[in-house]
Amino acid sequence: MLGTVKMEGHETSDWNSYYADTQEAYSSVPVSNMNSGLGSMNSMNTYMTMNTMTTSGNMTPASFNMSYANPGLGAGLSPGAVAGMPGGSAGAMNSMTAAGVTAMGTALSPSGMGAMGAQQAASMNGLGPYAAAMNPCMSPMAYAPSNLGRSRAGGGGDAKTFKRSYPHAKPPYSYISLITMAIQQAPSKMLTLSEIYQWIMDLFPYYRQNQQRWQNSIRHSLSFNDCFVKVARSPDKPGKGSYWTLHPDSGNMFENGCYLRRQKRFKCEKQPGAGGGGGSGSGGSGAKGGPESRKDPSGASNPSADSPLHRGVHGKTGQLEGAPAPGPAASPQTLDHSGATATGGASELKTPASSTAPPISSGPGALASVPASHPAHGLAPHESQLHLKGDPHYSFNHPFSINNLMSSSEQQHKLDFKAYEQALQYSPYGSTLPASLPLGSASVTTRSPIEPSALEPAYYQGVYSRPVLNTS
């Protein structure tokens, strides 16, 4: 059994601060040395004397320092040692009476810690200055278990106050699902923003808290999803705020009426002349949506053939087939004038085939207007076959190029277009077309076969800086 002792203290405040931590100690006193320590109380000559107590107040392990022990000492003393201590040390301590020794033994017992009373303080002549310090030092140890229990109880109460209560579970629906449910249940199939808020709060009590947070998300979902359309108020329905309804072409966005997961994302086709309309961003659970479904105005369901770029390429191809062949009077100035429409190629490509486009007088001008907008659009592999301009850094003589993979008739048709396109791209304004290229009108009208060797050695190798068989 070991007892621990705190040393080097001058004032009462120092001792109180030392014993705030019950695990702090410097040295230990064996229980077997207790009687010898009590017997040597008279011969204290190391750091202090029992009568004066004027030195620094430090005690050696051989001195009587049991009154300054921390809780480990009281718990480490056996009942026999505590009971035998008063009788064995009564005769050895001249300055202490039997009552004081008894009080000391009572104070050292685990059940009587903090029982230092006025009787012991009066009987201990030498320890008088420290009698007042013993009670404050021992009392925290006496009440330590109860204090710990009280602190645990108090901590439990505080933990309950800090614990967040969830009276209602969050519904497993995205904001788009909530808006769709609210609009579909309305008799008029359209609601204002405040009515959507109210419907959600009435049906789901979870959203009655933190309203500003989720209402912002509702507004963003309405603005950034094309399936929701804003409808202006009619004169017969005065009030504040516009109505929101579902897009007529959105259809059933949710599979089998289940709002837990959206089946597909609705994407509205933007007309070239339309100025408004929602953005194309995603809101709510848009990132988790299924594959996008683009709807053609004519009702076509093929997603690869109804994009505006695809229709624009087909429209231009149809115009090229029906365009008159340029006569000998088609000078480069005329071609440049018609090629000026290439700046608006992006808007022209978005025009559907059914719309009426202004006729282009020269075929090469139409050829130049299509490839000019190619760098801003990415084409699918089957669409790149219909495109009239290839990558300038790609060799057309590559074994796996798209030209070699096409049929012979399509390849000749493609190379015929290539001649005009390359001539328009690389020839300076006002200069004549290269004489080595077969640019006669007969080659356009009759589609006469053109050998690849007639185009590549004379022109392509001089234009491209990279090798002919470059695979990049």
From Swiss-Prot:
It comes from the Eukaryota. Its main location: nucleus. GO terms for biological process: alveolar secondary septum development; anatomical structure formation involved in morphogenesis; anatomical structure morphogenesis; cell differentiation; chromatin remodeling; dopaminergic neuron differentiation; dorsal/ventral neural tube patterning; epithelial cell maturation involved in prostate gland development. Transmembrane segments: none annotated. Keywords: Activator, Chromatin regulator, Developmental protein, DNA-binding, Nucleus, Phosphoprotein, Repressor, Transcription, Transcription regulation. Residues 273-289 have a biased composition (Gly residues). SUPFAM superfamilies: Winged helix' DNA-binding domain. It is found in: Nucleus. InterPro entries: Fork-head_N, Fork_head_dom, Forkhead_box_C, FOX_domain-containing, TF_fork_head_CS_1, TF_fork_head_CS_2, WH-like_DNA-bd_sf, WH_DNA-bd_sf. Residues 322-332, 351-366 have a biased composition (Low complexity). Highly expressed in prostate and ESR1-positive breast tumors. Overexpressed in esophageal and lung adenocarcinomas. Transcription factor that is involved in embryonic development, establishment of tissue-specific gene expression and regulation of gene expression in differentiated tissues. Is thought to act as a 'pioneer' factor opening the compacted chromatin for other proteins through interactions with nucleosomal core histones and thereby replacing linker histones at target enhancer and/or promoter sites. Binds DNA with the consensus sequence 5'-[AC]A[AT]T[AG]TT[GT][AG][CT]T[CT]-3'. Binds DNA as a monomer. Interacts with FOXA2. Interacts with NKX2-1. Interacts with HDAC7. Interacts with the histone H3-H4 heterodimer. Associates with nucleosomes containing histone H2A. Interacts with AR. Interacts with NR0B2. This is Hepatocyte nuclear factor 3-alpha. It comes from Homo sapiens. The lineage of its organism: Eukaryota, Metazoa, Chordata, Craniata, Vertebrata.
